[in-house]
């Protein structure tokens, strides 16, 4: 049975107990949230993934994407990126490999980590199709579903599937005033397949079969936003909302079948529309966990899109988003390297912290309180311990010497906290 089915039967699983303990939440409250579809625990029955809860009343989680491309493929490089994202606190990882060695890379990632692993199966189906000297849109239904079955058996915990890309959705794009059309790689591949074959999307037409596969292995569905806006001009348009309403119906079918499900959200959204997008999604999709890419709140900062995404993600998380997909400085420019991965994870961790302050998560509030106390006490070691990136904080602090170890080089003798404390001490004497 799936975690959702156990929860609905009133049974508390070891996975629920683990999540409740790590989140410091009542396990019965957690069970009810899982039973209602507001929380998922992406954990395939075939692996030893650490149970990680995503959704209502829990810490905001972050995902980091790695993986090869047809232009750059090196297993060791991808594993080095994995080490970095684990070091800086990613809660999940997605392997988005599209190169010939994608099987080897996924297995290496699975063998090296126990955090939830996600994929986009249609990438592998496309690679398999082109390896047979066919064009990618000639992939048949069997390859798509065979790929999903094989990945489920291998222990993939959650899969992004673009079930909302339908013939009607493509018409909505044609009827819209979009500047950039379809920018999701999986969404574009699916749309091209539909147009080439003049048939409905197999993942939509055979959704019940997809649910059977996921139910057998307790693979969590992540319903992809194939029509997400690729620029702020296209945000919250009819095509995006048309797909979202389809996903809302699919959420209900998934939950009815006992399959865990979350929904992916928009990519580029002006800051004035972020909160509304979260509210629309939560309403249409029955409060299923929301997994957002950013959203990026401006289009003119290439090289700094980890910052534009963190701004949007902070608002999104504070407004109800549950799962943040990191964005690196390399977004829109190149395949990310190790430093890009580091910067992307840290930026997303900051956004998650900001989100959890808004959600008043008790352990987050305690961490913020403890940091204030440490600063007031000039307890530098404690500050480094509590910091999201204590390594960098320590490096900056130690980069310059001061006459008094309590002070940093910014203010020196003009340190506001020390000045008041010294006068208070003198007055007492």
Swiss-Prot record:
Binds 1 [4Fe-4S] cluster per subunit. The cluster is coordinated with 3 cysteines and an exchangeable S-adenosyl-L-methionine. Zn(2+) binds at residues 268, 332. Its EC number is 4.1.99.17. Its cofactor is [4Fe-4S] cluster. Keywords: 4Fe-4S, Iron, Iron-sulfur, Lyase, Metal-binding, S-adenosyl-L-methionine, Thiamine biosynthesis, Zinc. It catalyses: 5-amino-1-(5-phospho-beta-D-ribosyl)imidazole + S-adenosyl-L-methionine = 4-amino-2-methyl-5-(phosphooxymethyl)pyrimidine + CO + 5'-deoxyadenosine + formate + L-methionine + 3 H(+). One of its GO terms (molecular function) is 4 iron, 4 sulfur cluster binding. InterPro entries: ThiC, ThiC/Bza_core_dom, ThiC/BzaA/B. Pathway: Cofactor biosynthesis; thiamine diphosphate biosynthesis. Substrate binds at residues 65, 94, 123, 162, 184-186, 225-228, 264, 291. Transmembrane segments: none annotated. GO terms for biological process: thiamine biosynthetic process; thiamine diphosphate biosynthetic process. [4Fe-4S] cluster binds at residues 408, 411, 415. It is an enzyme of class 4 (lyase). HAMAP family: ThiC. Belongs to the ThiC family. Catalyzes the synthesis of the hydroxymethylpyrimidine phosphate (HMP-P) moiety of thiamine from aminoimidazole ribotide (AIR) in a radical S-adenosyl-L-methionine (SAM)-dependent reaction. This is Phosphomethylpyrimidine synthase 1. It comes from Methanosphaera stadtmanae (strain ATCC 43021 / DSM 3091 / JCM 11832 / MCB-3).
